[in-house]
Amino acid sequence: MYSEGKLLKVFLIFAGFIIFSLCGEVVSQRYPPAPGLLKYLEQDVCYSLYYYLNWTSLADCKTNFEETGISDVPSTVKVRCQSKNSIRFETEPSEHWQLFILMEHDNFDPIPFTLIEPNNVFGELITTANKEYQIWSTYLDEYGTLQDWMEGPIVLKFDQRNQQPDDIKYNVTQEFKYIILGNDSYTINGKFVWNTTGDRDLCFDIANICQNTNMKHAKIWPTAHPSFDVENLVLNDECEIHVKGIHGTTKHKYKTPSCFELPECFLNNMEPEIPQDVAIAADQDLRGWWNINVAWAKPHFQPEIYNVTVRANMIRSIILPGNATETTFRNIPNTFLSAGKIYNVSVYAIIGQKASHTSRRAFTPGMLRWVWAGATAGAGCAAGGLLAATLLCCGHRRATSRVSQEDPDEKTPKEDDVEIIGIESGSADDHWEVRSDRVLLHEVIGEGAFGVVRRGTLAPGGKSVAVKMLKEFPSQEEVRSFRSEMELMKSVGAHPHVVSLVGCCSGRKPLIVAEYCSRGDLLSYLRSSWDIIVSKHTAKYYNNNMDSMDTSKLKVHKEHTKLVVNKLYELQGPCETELTPLDLLSFCRQIAMGMEFLASNRIVHRDLAARNVLVTEDKTLKIADFGLSRDIYEENQYKQKGNGKMPVKWMALESLTRRVYTTQSDVWSFGVVIWEIVTVGGSPYPEVPAARLVRSLRSGYRMPKPVNCSKPLYDIMRACWNASPRDRPTFPELHQKLDDLLHSACANEYITLEVDVDEAPSTPKPQRYIKMLIRGKLPWSRESYERPVNPTSNLYSSPPVIQTKTA
């Protein structure tokens, strides 16, 4: 009996130990993160909140992480959509911040998390397809205090075969609404609707890509009636919307209505068509005087009149009826236009008070070679006939545009050289002129050796502009160059991705009034975004929902903020949201579109770089300073030759060795700009001194592929850096290649915003994206990523230098 009782006692003790151990194991598994991971999680979450909390709250936030327990109240979160890369969930709204994490069983990988701001109900968490997770959540107050963790649902492994039926496309339909903005401005708003295929098919990623407007993208949260609104579409634009859901991506092409398809727009707007296919040619008669022929295509809708203007050392205009398609300026004296000089021709189509125009530039043919033949009296008749035939042949040579490797010696017309024929005061030819009293000047936003740029307001509409002017006591050469720049900007015309002329004052104190881009230059914009990426991802986590927060509702303590602001521009905007891979790819495409326009106008930029591209409030990129030299440069970026500075790290090999500048040399520079964008503001050739660059390029060296860049995108860069200019792609081809990349399913396949330097795969795969993004080490070292403490200059402060043109 005693032995049986003792045996029973031992059994009970052993059973109790087993039960205690099992219970302890269950409790330990219910606690969300392991202690080591909890430390990393608290760092990343608290630093993410640091942008909206003060310094004391940051310390409290870390302490609260250590003291948080487990709540008996279950979480209200529900998984609504699941794909191979993420889940999207819905929760109850709260007046507090909510923190959601994904715990993987028996694994010590970093923990994906997301923060949802007060009163929001949807969120997204990054997953890996072949893993099983559990969601945990908690609340945080405005001081960073955490409540107890609440246990949420299990997220099962994603089975793509069961989730994604084959060959299913969404039926996308659209309707457009015509909007009158005032001031003779019009736009289109589009609404796109598509079907769903069941309860698991309720979440979508949308990208809208148009030829003439910015790409727009959005996440569609769970809804049984999905739709997407696109505002501010351009009339007569070709677009494509991508709807990515559980069944893959459906691409729907559409074209926005033209003004002529909308009765209200047609009646109220009636913009004359821009003259197309403008061709110009000059020939010289036997007296040495010039005739310039101008021809253009017949428009679909005839304007009231045409105003055709030629500018050389004089201005001459002709008014023509609306059915005209050709005219000739005859008997221009060689005192106004000489051989081998540049001239500009503008064709304005005019209806009422509205005008559209196209401008072209060309060189007159070289000096005539007069051949005088001496002959004897007996052979005089034959020699005279031969001489006459030679002169007639030479006298009617046509002009052809040709490449200029040096700046042409162009002169602007003097006031007493102006000759105007058949033009009335206030007509289309002087519509650029703005009275100086209409421009209200504000603070200086840029300053160079020769000029100053101020932010301005243009009356009466109150439009923000950038006003460029010369400094006090300019030289005659500076005034001449400034006026040449003014005429050049008139002739370039308007494009969505080129900084356009708003107006000018051509009086004694000339002014250039241009578009104002509030976010400054692209290089500073990229680097400010990089600062945000580094600060938000210092440890081992990625908060993929922060970019959707309304930061205007949050309290920011400026005395503790980490934000670095370039005071030359309003850079608070870039510091509020980080860029996405889709943004970076769109930036490359926008620059290609702007350069395609300049190349079509036979304009060579010669200084294409991220610092020479401006960013507007809505992330539209505009190429600036095309064809101009800059005053101030970053150290080791420009090499002095005579009185000119050269952007050696952006220049093509032939430009460095032979000073040849063509559109194809701009293509080389564009490849460097792509590299700047992919590296989010990195300095090119970080390991190569400028003095050794030419030797390195000649030997075949090219910048290696950035670790966060895919092979297809890097192949585009390498194609731009081909040693043979003829073998480089053209800008239309680059535009098409970037369109093809954007049309693919996921921009993350081509660019990631952070990389794992421990493993550094040459081509990051999509399933590795989150792991690379949440690792704690930075992808670029201080030595290879040069960042100036202060901006070296801005895009408006370049000295005006004459434009270079190609054939």
From Swiss-Prot:
The chain crosses the membrane at residues 371-391. One of its GO terms (cellular component) is plasma membrane. Residues 29-370 are extracellular. This is Tyrosine-protein kinase receptor torso. The active site is at residue 607. Residues 1-28 form the signal peptide. One of its GO terms (molecular function) is metal ion binding. It is a single-pass type I membrane protein. It catalyses: L-tyrosyl-[protein] + ATP = O-phospho-L-tyrosyl-[protein] + ADP + H(+). Belongs to the protein kinase superfamily. Tyr protein kinase family. Glycans are attached at residues 54, 171, 183, 195, 307, 323, 344. Its main location: membrane. Homodimer; disulfide-linked. The record marks 205, 219 as: Implicated in PTTH ligand binding. It is an enzyme of class 2 (transferase). Its EC number is 2.7.10.1. Residues 392-807 are cytoplasmic. Residues 439-738 form the Protein kinase domain. The lineage of its organism: Eukaryota, Metazoa, Ecdysozoa, Arthropoda, Hexapoda. May be auto-phosphorylated on tyrosine residues. At least one of the 3 cysteine residues Cys-381, Cys-393 or Cys-394 is involved in the formation of interchain disulfide bonds. The disulfide bond sites in the extracellular region are not involved in homodimer formation. Disulfide bonds join 46-61, 81-203, 210-239, 259-265. Its cofactor is Mg(2+). InterPro entries: Kinase-like_dom_sf (IPR011009), Prot_kinase_dom (IPR000719), Protein_kinase_ATP_BS (IPR017441), RTK (IPR050122), Ser-Thr/Tyr_kinase_cat_dom (IPR001245), Tor_FN3_1st (IPR054167), Tor_FN3_2nd (IPR049336), Tor_FN3_3nd (IPR054166). Keywords: ATP-binding, Cell membrane, Developmental protein, Disulfide bond, Glycoprotein, Kinase, Magnesium, Membrane, Metal-binding, Nucleotide-binding, Phosphoprotein, Signal, Transferase, Transmembrane, Transmembrane helix, Tyrosine-protein kinase.
